[in-house]
Amino acid sequence: MAKMTTLKMKERLEKELQAPNRQFSYNRDNDALTVVQSGKKVTLAIPQIIANYENDGDAAVEKIVYYVEEGFRAAAGNVELENNKANVYPVVRATSFPGETKAGEVLLTDDHTAETKIFYAVDLGKSYRFIEESMLKKAQLTHEEIREAAFNNLANLEIPLKKDSVNGNDFYFVRTNDGYDASRLLNEAFLREMREKLTGEMVLAVPHQDVLIIGDIQDNTGYDVLAHMTMDFFADGLVPITSLPFVYNNGKLEPIFIMAKNRLKE
């Protein structure tokens, strides 16, 4: 595979994302390509895309193009919230994620942890549309009704687990790529079930939206492996959330710092 440079990747993305009424701007300071269409904006971090390209080849670029196209398609469509309660889900994002749209519409959110925040979205099949507070009034629905519907729908999603073990420490991965892998962190019944199953300390991570990691940590090696794993996923994710794992105790999630082969207390 030929060496991919920032300029080559920028040109390739512009070519594959070219469309009528679509503009591009490039920020050389942070190597970011911004795509604008009908007032909607998507910013792509070129270095991150190149890193994914080096691992996955053309599939990494195809995935980016797909997400951008579906995102613009979802933003352009009118979503009727009233008849879509069965398609509403909670979505986990970093606390730094914007709480309003570029047009100034406030998004429907709930607090979660010091690192994460809950947003709500209408599933559109291949993408989803974040719910704005103004949509509630139009649909004559309350925040609580949306929250209840979203969490009920989340509880009905399957949770297939893949397991890996390192020196007696077990790691479970949820990676369905349905857009709600990280959201399964919000499934309280699932967390309680896993807590009963695990024998060590239960530590979870949502480095990006398309993965949930659950560690059954027995020793410092387990913490070390989880720390490196979380950082790797965080760097590779299209929608990063947080590089900090969470300890799950007594029904609560507490962010912790892990460095090298030692665990630092929360």
Swiss-Prot record:
<comment type="similarity">
    <text>Belongs to the UPF0354 family.</text>
</comment>
<protein>
    <recommendedName>
        <fullName>UPF0354 protein lmo1608</fullName>
    </recommendedName>
</protein>
<dbReference type="InterPro" id="IPR010838">
    <property type="entry name" value="DUF1444"/>
</dbReference>
<dbReference type="Pfam" id="PF07285">
    <property type="entry name" value="DUF1444"/>
</dbReference>
